[in-house]
């Protein structure tokens, strides 16, 4: 079973964090939510409280198939300011394992860590200048090697289905999308 860690910082964007968690779990992926704050309870940018599965200090993360960074502000900024998160992301990328980020996180975190150098990437409008060394695509979802980026809240579903296809397979991703009636929305 594939293993994903999702880092939750105060100020995360609700939809961008929870839709991928939901879709991946429906697809049989082992997803662990991780609080990077001082408490398991993390508050979203819109005041929704989520209790993470573990605290950052409890994680090893070396078994991660994917590290996922939700967007939202100040959530993305809080992720970047956490030295432990930055080390995990850099190590994950250096090992050639998957890293994914959505909204502000591609620029605020991945760009500033040098992970996007020479890659194609997307992000929420206004954060393009932070995609250091990347070619901005303006697409909802962009995949370049082991890095997947997405634009913003509206991209949360296609982003989640792309991650599921990468981790499990396209057939499973399509089945989950059908069961969630996503394909009918896009018709």
Describe these PLM feature segments.
Residues 41-53:
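A cross-family phosphate/adenosyl-ligand binding-site feature
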Residues 12-16, 41:
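Short N-terminal binding/cap micro-motifs at the start of the first secondary-structure element
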Residues 18, 35-38:
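Short glycine/proline-centered loop/turn elements that form peptide/ligand docking sites
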Residues 21:
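Histidine-anchored nucleotide/phosphate-binding helix
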Residues 3-6, 12, 27-36, 53-187:
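Active-site-adjacent pocket-lining segments in enzyme domains
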């Amino acid at each position: 079973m594939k293993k994903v860690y999702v880092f939750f910082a105060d100020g995360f964007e609700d939809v961008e964090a929870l839709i991928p968690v939901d879709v991946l779990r429906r697809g049989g992926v082992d997803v662990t939510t991780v609080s990077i704050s001082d408490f398991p309870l993390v508050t979203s940018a819109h005041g929704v409280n989520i209790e993470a599965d573990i605290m950052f200090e409890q994680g090893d993360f070396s078994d991660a198939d994917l590290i996922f960074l939700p967007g939202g502000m100040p959530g993305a900024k809080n992720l970047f300011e956490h030295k432990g998160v930055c080390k995990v992301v850099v190590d994950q990328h250096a090992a050639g394992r998957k890293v994914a980020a959505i909204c502000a996180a591609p620029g605020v975190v991945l760009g500033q860590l040098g992970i996007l150098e020479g890659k194609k990437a997307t992000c929420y409008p206004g954060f393009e200048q932070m995609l250091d060394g990347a070619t901005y695509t303006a697409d909802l979802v962009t995949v370049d090697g082991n890095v997947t980026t997405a634009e913003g809240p509206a991209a949360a579903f296609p982003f989640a289905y792309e991650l599921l296809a990468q981790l499990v397979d396209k057939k499973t991703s399509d089945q989950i999308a059908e069961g969630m009636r996503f394909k009918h929305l896009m018709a």
